[in-house]
Every structure is written in C-alpha cells, then in structure tokens.
Amino acid sequence: MIVFISLFTIFLTVLSLLTNNIIVWWSIFLLMTVVFVLLNKSSKSYTSIFNYFVIQESLGLLFLLFSSGLLQFFIILLKIGVAPLHFWIFNVTNNIFNYALMWFLTFQKLPFLTILLQIFWLSSVYILLMGLLICYVQIFVMKSYKNLLIISSTESFNWIVLGLFFSMFNTLYLFVYYFLLMILLISKFSKSSGYNFVNWETALVFLNIPFSVSFFVKIFSLSEIFKFDSFFTLLLLFSMFLSVLAFSFWLINLSMKNNEELSGSNKMNYFIIFPLMVISII
C-alpha cells in the first residue's frame, strides 16, 4: 500500500506540473487529504485526521473562491505549513507517529510544492526569511523532543522552498535526500519508545554536520539568498546560533545516559547514506 500511495503522490506531482487548471489543483488537494486519512486510519489517529481534514478542506474551498494569485499563494503556504504560517501543524502531529509522521513532514507536501512554484510571488522571499527567524526562536524555547523535530523539519522545509525559487532541479534532488534521511530519523519514533530516535546521529544531523542533507540545503539556499539580500543572510546566520543552543539540549541528555538501549538505531544506514550525500555536491 505504501508503494502504491508513493507512486500515486508522484503522479499527482507530475500532473500539477503539467496543468495550471484551478479545478485540477483543487482535486489534487482533495486526493492528498484522502491519502493522509488512509495512512493514519490504521493507527486510529482520529483527532489528527479530523483536524487535518477540517483545515485542508476549508482552505481548499477558499482556494476555489479567491481568483487572485496572491491570495491563492498564501492559502497554499498555509496548506503546506510553511513558516510563519505553520501554527496549525502541532494540532495534527500530536497523535501521529512512525512513518505517518515522516510522510506528513515530507512527501505529503510534494504536490503542493510544485503548485506553489507556478504561482510564485517574488516578495514572498522576505516572508519565508521571516518565517525562518520565527522557527529559530521557537526551537530555542522548545524542549520536547518531538516538537523540536517538527519545528526543525519545518525550518528545513522553508530552506527547500527558498531554494526552489532559485533552482527547481537542485531542490527536488535535495528533497529526495531529505526524504530518505527523515525515514531514518523518524522510523524509530513510536508510542512505545518515544525517545529511541534521539541518538547521536539524529543530533548531529540537526546540528547541520557537514555533508548531511540539511547542511547542503542551507548552504545552497544561503549562497543564492546572498545575491538577493546580504543583510538578511547575515541576520539568518546569527539567528542559527539559537538552533545550535536548542539542539545542545539533545547533546547534554545523550552524554548523561546509557546509550546501550539505543543500539538498534540504524547506525549502518547512516554510514551508507552520508557518503552518498557527498555526491550531491558534484
């Protein structure tokens, strides 16, 4: 079923690129909501399903009502959960775990991303940069492992959206690596073992260790943003220090507890995928 849903999502993504019909786009929104419901029905995450359905379908109706490209652009930003319009995400993620959480943070957003590219508003770059600053402040004040992961994923996705406006091919290529990495990070996160995913590899990835996918996403996007506005680039670099302080909370906890219980943490997969990430530079 997962393979079928993944292929179906890729099909909807290609379809959204081939057409600019609003009715077709709205149909894609509806089908992606159905996909989310199917993935979470087996885990009985009814609260998350209800919240997601109400939010997405309400925004979908507003998307049909407003013919202005600018209003539709903001509606899609809100549907994806791009910062600073990500306030509704926590109402959905509270009751989803494992691969459903990974899907919601990554692949669920792919068809929306290609539609967003087609109705791009140039001045929205400043809104996305402001969203990054808000994410860094939120990361600094949060201490929940799961919420830190969600906010960090939202922040990384903002970088992906920024990069998409500058280079579509490079960003989609990095999105695939980002998707694979999130599979490794979130697959151990479940109701029965809520802290098993917090291992040294996870902490180092979110601290932007060189040659990790989050490192590449930020470097490529910063190099393009610097051509656009050097002041915001400098401000973002200073604000990134807040996220380092927040994720040091993970490092302190890891250094003070027995890590033998984290032995099944996919270490071999990390050693395999990290060298492959270097290829993305070439």
From Swiss-Prot:
Primary location: mitochondrion
Phenotype upon changing L128F: In strain: ED3092 and ED3101
Subcellular location: Mitochondrion inner membrane
Effect of A203M: In strain: ED3092 and ED3101
Membrane topology: Multi-pass membrane protein
Effect noted on mutating V24M: In strain: PB826
GO cellular component, one term: mitochondrial inner membrane
GO molecular function: NADH dehydrogenase (ubiquinone) activity
Record keywords, A-Z: Electron transport, Membrane, Mitochondrion, Mitochondrion inner membrane, NAD, Respiratory chain, Translocase, Transmembrane, Transmembrane helix, Transport, Ubiquinone
Documented EC number(s): 7.1.1.2
Impact after mutating A203V: In strain: BW287, JU403, JU439, JU516, JU793 and PB826
Transmembrane domains' residue ranges: 17-37, 58-78, 87-107, 115-135, 166-186, 202-222, 232-252
Keyword Translocase belongs to the record: yes
Substitution effect: S190L: In strain: ED3083
First-tier enzyme category under EC: translocase
Catalytic reactions of this protein: a ubiquinone + NADH + 5 H(+)(in) = a ubiquinol + NAD(+) + 4 H(+)(out)
Outcome after substituting V137T: In strain: ED3092 and ED3101
Role played: Core subunit of the mitochondrial membrane respiratory chain NADH dehydrogenase (Complex I) that is believed to belong to the minimal assembly required for catalysis. Complex I functions in the transfer of electrons from NADH to the respiratory chain. The immediate electron acceptor for the enzyme is believed to be ubiquinone.
Family, as annotated: Belongs to the complex I subunit 2 family.
Descriptive protein name: NADH-ubiquinone oxidoreductase chain 2
Gene that produces this protein: nd2
